[in-house]
Amino acid sequence: MRLLIRFRDVNSLIKYLREELDKLSVTKRRLEEVLGMDAVVDIVELKDDNIGITRVRTTELKWLLNEIDTRIEAISVILEELRGRLGGVNYTGLVLLELEDGIPRRVLLSQPLSLG
């Protein structure tokens, strides 16, 4: 599923991406700590107004660590691309972040762009 998130300018997009990167990094560190314990955890899933609880061993959650790594890499690539192409310039206008299955894929900027 594809989703577009709109931002008022590039700086607000960068701020959002950095916050997401920070949250993912903290989650990854915590998950790595838990994976080393070989413990049992409860996973709470909210779907279609229903709550599901599943109990799994932490060793079965390595796929989640891979998913987090994929998201961290995608965000890092977008941030690096924005730094490389725009430098420190903040463009205003229509700034869209495209997510594909929850993973940031690309940034779309409106034309013509104005300096903010």
Where would I find each of the regions flagged by the language model?
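Short, charge/polar-rich alpha-helical segments
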Residues: 1-34
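Amphipathic alpha-helical coiled-coil segments and their boundaries
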Residues: 3, 10, 17, 47-50, ...
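Surface-exposed beta-strand edges and flanking loops
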Residues: 7, 99, 109-111
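Short, surface-exposed, low-complexity cationic segments
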Residues: 11, 108-116
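Metal/cofactor-centered catalytic core regions of large enzymes
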Residues: 22, 44, 51
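Coiled-coil heptad-register positions
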Residues: 25-28, 32-35, 39-42, 46, ...
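Coiled-coil termination/hinge junctions
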Residues: 58-105
